[in-house]
Design a protein with these regions (language model features):
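Bacterial N-terminal signal peptides
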Residues: 9-16
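Acidic, Ser/Thr/Pro-rich low-complexity intrinsically disordered segments
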Residues: 309-360, 369, 377-383
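Class I SAM-dependent methyltransferase SAM-binding "motif I" and its flanking Rossmann-like core
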Residues: 132, 148-194
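Noncatalytic accessory or regulatory domains flanking protease catalytic cores in secreted, cell-surface
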Residues: 346-420
Length: 422
């Protein structure tokens, strides 16, 4: 029998992992671009039009609805994905070392408190860790509430994520179409001129929130404003964002619902939001500066809480540097497997021009297997960037209710290796 991520998935007709790989781009060092959360108490969508139009890869969590019925199995399966399971101990959002496995998360509309509660404290912490490690976050309606600390009615909900460390305000507006204006200095104008009039018509709104300028925290920015005179939301933030520092991901909250539109300025709006979140992705971190003659073992598991020495995940890069001395005749970089872990494809790259990536590195070894060597004759003195890339990944299998992981599930908990410069 073929291994599956969740062999008991057939017990539930509610949860699926839907995968659309429009443009797998391993040079970025992420497994996929977007993870769309349509879990418990959220709208479950099969695809995101903006991801399709931007040619971004996406995977989606879908669960049961009130009309179809929600069972304990739905909760167990959602949290097996997001919190962890035997195949993936720290969950689908994170690599074994805690780095983000996706470039960003998108959270659908629905009921924020109920979804946050369903995530459990451990699941909410996975989202916080994802953003802290550099993953982006975009949420609309319920997803916007969920990002915040709380609201004017209750400034601190334990069910919320608090990745935007401030409050929002309930617009008290249901099932209406609203207009949106684009401030002249909005960063979203980098991606679209929105027809030249800085105005977007007929964006659906159903219980969403807004950001009062008086409540905007330092470092946050309002990207779009409501144009709806009958309500206090008028002239206040419709979409706002926050990036805590250079190493964290950008968090963006959107009160209304542009996400399902397939053409026109409302699609432009959603595309611009996604692109600005992705623009906030920080540069990868260097694991260590290697010393010639000193092997470095990357064998720790997630539970060891030692990211600098933790195993590599699927489609992930580990980056290193080494200082090449004057007069060096030959430089050898060796990648070695540990017993029982030979059957993985790890690539080796080196570059003097910044981070060593597939497609841009002068020196490379992309042979099959893990054990390999890269030899550089007469290397120039200076800083040489090295990287290890794990090309082994899971496969996806289409099922009636979506796509499951199959094949190399073992890679999800990471591949250990040793790297040595001589």
């Amino acid at each position: 029998m073929k291994n599956r991520y969740f062999p008991f998935l057939t017990l539930s007709l509610c949860l699926s992992l839907f995968s659309t790989a429009h443009s797998q781009t391993p040079e970025r060092g992420f497994y996929k671009d977007i993870y769309m959360d349509g879990g418990l108490s959220l709208t479950s969508k099969q695809y995101l039009p903006s991801a399709r139009s931007l040619m971004l890869s996406i995977e989606t969590l879908r669960t049961g609805t009130k009309s179809l019925g929600i069972t304990d199995v739905d909760t167990l399966l959602q949290n097996a994905l997001l919190v962890g399971n035997e195949f993936d101990t720290n969950g689908i959002l994170l690599y074994p070392d805690g780095a983000p496995r996706y470039r960003m998360v998108y959270v659908n509309g629905g009921t924020a408190k109920s979804h946050g509660r369903s995530l459990t404290p451990e699941g909410r912490e996975r989202f916080r860790a994802f953003v802290k490690a550099g993953g982006g976050y975009l949420g609309s309606c319920a997803g916007a509430y969920l990002a915040c600390e709380g609201t004017h009615g209750n400034p601190h909900y334990e069910e919320y994520l608090g990745i935007y460390p401030g409050i929002c305000t309930n617009a008290q507006l249901q099932n209406k179409r609203v207009c949106v204006t684009v401030p002249a200095d909005s960063p979203l104008l980098r991606y679209s001129d929105f027809g030249g009039d800085l105005h977007i018509d007929s964006v659906y709104h159903n219980g969403g929130c807004y950001m009062d300028y008086a409540d905007l925290i330092p470092g946050a920015e309002i990207l779009l404003q409501y144009d709806y005179p009958p309500k206090p939301m008028h002239g206040n933030g419709c979409v706002w964002s926050y990036k805590a520092d250079e190493q964290t991901g950008r968090v963006m909250a959107c009160g209304p619902h542009p996400e399902g539109i397939v053409s026109g300025e409302r699609l432009d709006m959603m595309e611009a939001m996604v692109q600005y979140v992705l623009e906030g992705t920080p540069q990868p971190r260097i694991k260590a500066s290697l010393t010639k003659g000193e092997p470095r073992l990357m064998s720790c598991k997630t539970e060891d809480n030692d990211p600098a020495h933790t195993r590599i995940g699927d489609k992930q890069y580990h980056h290193f540097t080494v200082e090449v001395p004057e007069g060096c005749d030959t430089l050898k970089i060796k990648l070695s497997s540990l017993e029982g872990y030979q059957n993985y494809d790890l690539f080796l790259f080196a570059s003097y021009e910044g981070l060593a990536m597939l497609g841009s590195s002068k020196y490379k070894n992309v042979g099959q297997g893990l054990d390999k060597e890269l030899v550089i004759l007469a290397p120039k003195a200076g800083t040489l960037f090295l990287s290890v890339f794990c090309d082994t990944t899971v496969e996806s299998e289409e099922a009636r209710y979506g796509t499951m992981y199959t094949g190399r599930l073992d890679v999800l908990n990471g591949v250990p290796y040793q790297i040595l410069v001589e």
